[in-house]
Curated annotation (Swiss-Prot):
Cofactors demanded by this protein: Mn(2+)
Gene3D superfamilies associated with the record: Phosphorylase Kinase, domain 1, Ribonuclease Inhibitor, Transferase(Phosphotransferase) domain 1
Name under which the protein is recorded: Receptor protein kinase WSS1
Sequence positions that bind ATP: 586-594, 607
Tissue: Expressed in young and mature leaves.
Transmembrane segments: 478-498
Recorded superkingdom: Eukaryota
UniProt EC number: 2.7.11.1
Catalytic residues as annotated in Swiss-Prot or TrEMBL: 708 (proton acceptor)
GO CC term, one of those recorded: plasma membrane
């Protein structure tokens, strides 16, 4: 024992020696790489053993010998780069620009600390297959004027989430515009000029709100870059835009709020009216609009040094000023179609009649006919057509028009023919005068008949619905009158019946009693929510039928609730919860108590809403909640199975979650008896919650906002998979008759700043709360903890303060977590996401779909148990086209606050 005790003090010394030996070995590896480079590039003139003393080589402080910077810029060096260069794993800057280096660029995948990479102006012949892999700290990448073979921007660039500048002009980049760049939300400077890019700008580029300089000009491919340039409207920090010499189409978007100084779009195919949001930019110093197909008034810019907009456009006048009323009207019509290029080629000048614009026929200098059939038009029909008082014939058939036929077109005094056949118009056909022949078949109108108005037209689809004379109208009129009378009588009978029932049921519902009169059983029924909505609930569920179902023990709970037309009386709920016994209480919330119930051998959760808090709006709020919840079906949202109303009573039946709440697993371990969650389990739960909220925000038929997202509203099943609950007081994002315009809902600590101060509700309110939950999952702390010192009570504040120091932050992490090196790396990524989600300004927070994509890569990497390959097949198999497109729209997303926070690995502003 004594001998062993004497040996113990030697252990730390031995470990120290081993660490020192490892450091020496790594330093030796760096030295070997530098010597290899000296041999490959003799002109460097490096000689000796002290590589840290070589010109252009910088080593870390302390004499460990690790090379941190290699600056060989503009030295006219020739030679090749050795493969051993990849062993410089501590390198933060590799600057090789302005030389004549040849051969292949070696793999750089091990340089996880590399922040600056400059390859410009060399003669490299190829890039490594793993180019940009592993460069998670990269901030500046410049590789202009390289004679490489054609290559696409690799998807691995998405890992460079801190990338500030990507400059690769004249670098042989080919293929469609790389949509992966939309994930680089820290990107401020993007220069891809003089390459071979094709296709349009992905809509996802609108997420690049930090962009200051965008240069895509002079693509050399035959097709060039094309399509609209709408994405630049969201780039509010943009100062320089060069997209000249491409094939972009459509109008200039609204540029209000931007900071543009240089705007060069010459030599494209842009159309439309130059917007006042561009001409009124006080920051603008240089503008070039030449050789497009701009229309309307000539723009009047303030005095700026560089201005070029005259040549090659179709402005109505040679000097700034308004166009003629007729020209203005037709340009408004073109605006509805998105200013199509085929029209813009001839719709120029200030006189549509001389020479006549394509599709325009004039009589006495006024438009009498418009024929734009088969012009591949999309967009909407403009109400401005009503200003053409001499218009007799309007043919917009066989296009792709959407929206409705404007009612105002019925006021056209000279109109005789309206042909909108074979489009995608919706709504109803307005009621035109009998003299108007309307051709509207082949659309998506609510009625099977595609026409209205017109008398005696030869086309079988253009007949008047009310102008036919003779005996046919009288039987139809009699039939209609009979139906109306019958409906009135029916409603009168229903009203009397309801009044009679209300008088019989004046006594308040007593949930503690299992004895219910037949009349009460009829009124106090649970209505069943199936996959297609709420059942009509016209009659109570017979007790004998319920008993029959109870006997069928093989049926599961979903079959019990989703059988067609199935309804359960309130007796079932009373029995299931033992008269709402205290022993069955699962939890209490601001709007009521949740009980555990047993239906047909299956557990459910019955929420009994507090009648005192529902107030006079209780019925409206309750029905709105049902209307919302019946439309929401998702794997990670707690499903509503049914509901019951009587007087002030509100009862909701949900699926039962046996794993408790996330709060119990994070902050109430002693009371709940749960063991701490592992990091893998926490990541999986975080992804589940994100997917549920993502569905509410953008994949459901309507956009829903939770407004009270917190750990106690996140329920877990037996496998610790999460579902979001208690979104019954959700406020529909778009106002409807059943939107809940109530007080601010939510829990202090999880409220976004703008919501707490102004009550303004957007989806970013939920994103903020989600970020707070991520912080709780990382730290194991409550969002507000009065037991801590005053400067540490608010989790968000202390979290954002500690995240700036990686070592300090490590002590801030939940001590119950056992993290490997890989686990620590993933935790830092989640912490970074939490920081962005809780940004003060809503526009700085990511959308939930981007949170899903960022977490998905981490969860897939860890491959936690109980995640099947087809885990989400159930929610997508019935997903409509709208939801699928919205789902596919979302790419990986990170965001950078422009104020204070940098990345974990390298400074935000690199000084090199």
């Amino acid at each position: 024992m004594g001998r062993d005790a004497r040996r113990l003090p030697l252990l730390p010394f031995l470990l120290l020696l081993l660490a020192a030996a490892a450091g020496v070995a790594e330093s030796a590896t760096d030295a070997e790489a530098i010597h290899d480079l000296a041999r490959s590039v003799p002109a460097l003139g490096w000689d000796g053993d002290n590589v840290c003393g070589f010109e252009g080589v910088t080593c870390e402080r302390g004499g460990a010998g690790k090379v941190t910077e290699l600056n060989l810029a503009d030295r006219g060096l020739s030679g090749t780069l050795p493969d051993s260069l990849s062993s410089l794993t501590s390198l933060t800057a590799l600057q090789l620009q302005g030389n004549a280096l040849t051969g292949a660029v070696p793999s750089l995948a091990r340089m996880g600390s590399l922040a600056r990479l400059a390859l410009d102006g060399n003669a490299f012949t190829s890039l490594p297959p793993d180019f940009l892999h592993g460069l998670t700290s990269l901030q500046y990448l410049t590789m202009e004027n390289l004679p490489l073979p054609p290559w696409p921007v690799p998807d691995a660039i998405a890992n460079c989430s801190s990338l500030d500048t990507f400059s690769a002009s004249n670098a042989s980049i080919s293929g469609p515009f790389p949509a992966v760049l939309a994930t680089l939300v820290s990107l401020r400077n993007l220069r891809l000029s003089y390459n071979n890019l094709t296709g349009g700008l992905p809509p996802e580029l609108s997420s690049l709100i930090a962009m200051e300089s965008l240069q895509l000009n002079n693509q050399r491919s035959d097709d060039k870059l094309s399509g609209p340039i709408d994405v630049i409207a969201s780039m509010k920090s943009l100062k320089l835009l060069w997209i000249q010499s491409n094939k972009f189409t459509g109008p200039i978007p609204d540029l209000n709020g931007t900071q543009l100084e240089a705007f060069n779009v010459r030599d494209n195919m842009l159309t439309g009216v130059v917007p006042p949001s561009l001409t009124g930019l006080m920051s603008l110093k240089n503008v070039s609009l030449s050789n497009n197909n701009f229309q309307g008034p000539k723009p009047a810019f303030a005095a700026i040094p560089g201005q070029d907009e005259d040549s090659g456009n179709g402005f109505c006048l040679n000097t700034p000023g308004p166009c003629s009323p007729l020209t203005t009207t037709l340009l408004q019509v073109a605006e509805g179609f998105g200013y199509p290029y085929e029209l813009a080629k001839t719709w120029k000048g200030n006189d549509p009649c001389s020479p006549a614009w394509v599709g325009i026929v004039c009589t006495s200098s006024d438009v009498s006919m418009i024929n734009l059939s088969r012009k591949n038009l999309s967009g909407r029909i403009s109400p401005a057509l009503a200003n053409l008082t001499r218009l007799a014939r309007l043919d917009l058939s066989n296009n792709n028009l959407t929206g409705v036929i404007p009612d105002v077109l019925t006021t056209l005094p000279s109109l005789t023919v309206l042909n909108v056949a074979n489009n995608r118009l919706t709504g109803e056909v307005p009621k035109f005068k009998p003299s108007v022949n309307v051709l509207a078949q082949g659309n998506l109108f609510g009625q099977s008949s595609g026409s209205s108005g017109g008398g005696g037209g030869s086309d079988g689809d253009s007949s008047s619905s009310d102008s036919a004379g003779g005996g046919k109208s009288k039987p139809n009129t009699g039939m209609i009158i009979g139906i109306i009378v019958a409906v009135i009588i029916l409603f009168a009978c229903i009203a009397l019946l309801v009044h009679h029932r209300k008088k019989k049921n004046v006594e308040k519902f007593r949930p503690v009693s299992t004895k219910t009169s037949p009349a009460e059983s009829e009124m106090m029924k649970i209505q069943v929510v199936g996959a297609n909505g709420i059942s009509n609930g016209s009659s109570a569920f017979p007790t004998e039928l319920y008993s029959h179902v109870s006997a069928a023990n093989s049926s599961n709970i979903s079959e019990l609730f989703e059988s067609h037309g199935m309804q359960l009386s309130v007796e079932v709920l009373l029995k299931a919860t033992n008269n709402f016994s205290e022993d069955c209480i699962l939890g209490r919330g601001g709007f009521g108590v949740v009980f555990k119930g047993n239906l047909n051998g299956k557990l459910v959760a019955v929420k009994r809403c507090d009648s005192g808090t529902m107030g006079t709006k209780g019925q409206e709020e309750f029905l709105a909640e049902i209307d919302v919840l019946r439309k929401v079906r998702h794997r990670h949202l707690v499903a509503l199975l049914g509901y019951c109303t009587h007087g002030n009573e509100r009862l909701l039946v949900y699926e039962y979650m046996s794993g408790g709440t996330l709060r119990e697993h994070l902050c109430d371990l002693q009371q709940s008896g749960f063991i701490p969650l592992t990091w893998t389990q926490r990541m999986t739960i975080a992804l589940d919650v994100a997917r549920g909220i993502e569905y509410l925000h953008g994949l459901a038929q309507e956009t829903f906002i939770h407004r009270d997202l917190k750990p106690s509203n996140i329920l877990l099943d037996q496998d610790l998979r999460a579902k979001v609950s208690d979104f019954g007081l959700v406020k529909l994002a778009k106002d409807t008759d059943k939107s809940l315009m109530t007080r601010i809902a939510g829990t202090f600590g999880y409220l976004a700043p703008e919501y707490a101060t102004t009550g303004k509700v957007t989806t970013k309110v939920d994103v903020y709360a989600y970020g707070v939950i991520l912080m709780e999952m990382i730290t194991g702390r409550k969002v507000l903890d009065d037991s801590l010192p005053d400067d540490e009570t608010h989790l968000v504040t202390i979290f954002r303060r500690n995240i700036l120091d990686k070592e300090k932050f490590r002590k801030f992490v939940d001590p119950t977590l056992e993290l490997s090196a890989e686990g620590w790396t993933s935790l830092l990524e989640v912490a970074d996401l939490a920081r962005h989600c809780t940004a003060r300004e809503p526009y700085q927070r990511p959308d939930m779909c981007h949170c899903v994509n960022r977490l998905s890569s981490l969860v897939d990497q860890w491959k936690p148990t109980n995640i099947d390959e087809d885990d989400y097949e159930g929610e997508t198999s019935e997903m409509g086209l709208h939801q699928q497109l919205e789902k596919w729209r979302c790419d990986d997303f990170t965001i950078s606050d422009s104020d204070t926070f940098g990345s974990f690995n390298v400074p935000r502003k690199y000084n090199g």
